[in-house]
């Protein structure tokens, strides 16, 4: 991403949409806001487990890339993004060894198979939406060298709509990707969403 500002969706930053542990999680996430208006249910399938907060780095890359296109004046923003595994790993500050490519594919699988149901962004009372983070993805490997060459990922409608609505995006610190703990990442996202640049900070009870 270079000097490109990192962007993420406000709605996703403040709610528990992702597993905070790297080991496979199968137990669903059940969340309801204190006023009962906003709720989230996240479910995983046994084969792959739940999408993690580290997997979400791919969605941050997608949001940042689409936001750059938008800033450059592109009106018809694509829901399918094309890149190389190497460039994506470098952008989210990961290694580029063989294991890193395997973990990237595993992350794509979790993002595609994790199922979310939520009332967030509902336009009517008692309305809810169901989606996966990714609708589909491809990962191309050279037949002779077995080296990763290119890849695509297609965002779900819910994710895409949240990104192209520029007002729903917040800028994140470029060192966010260097945070190693799941709880650290979650706390940063919540604090960034609520405190932002307020001089008085934000009190969490």
Features from the language model and the residues they span:
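Charged, alpha-helix-forming regions
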Residues: 1-205
């Amino acid at each position: 991403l270079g000097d490109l500002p990192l962007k993420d969706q406000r709605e996703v930053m403040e709610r528990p949409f992702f597993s905070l542990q790297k080991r496979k999680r199968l137990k669903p996430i059940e969340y309801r806001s204190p006023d009962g208006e906003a709720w989230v249910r996240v479910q995983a399938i046994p084969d792959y487990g739940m999408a993690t907060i580290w997997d979400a780095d791919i969605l941050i890359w997608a949001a940042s890339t689409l936001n750059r296109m938008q800033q450059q004046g592109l009106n018809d923003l694509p829901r399918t993004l094309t890149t190389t595994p190497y460039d994506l790993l470098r952008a989210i500050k990961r290694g580029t060894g063989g294991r890193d490519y395997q973990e990237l594919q595993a992350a794509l699988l979790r993002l595609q198979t994790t199922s979310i149901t939520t009332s967030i962004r509902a336009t009517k009372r008692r309305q809810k939406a169901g989606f996966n983070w990714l609708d589909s993805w491809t990962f191309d490997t050279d037949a002779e060298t077995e080296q990763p060459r290119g890849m695509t990922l297609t965002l779900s409608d819910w994710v895409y709509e949240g990104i192209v609505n520029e007002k729903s995006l917040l800028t994140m610190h470029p060192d966010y990707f260097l945070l190693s703990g799941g709880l650290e990442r979650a706390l940063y996202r919540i604090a960034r969403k609520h405190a932002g640049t307020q001089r008085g900070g934000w009190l969490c009870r």
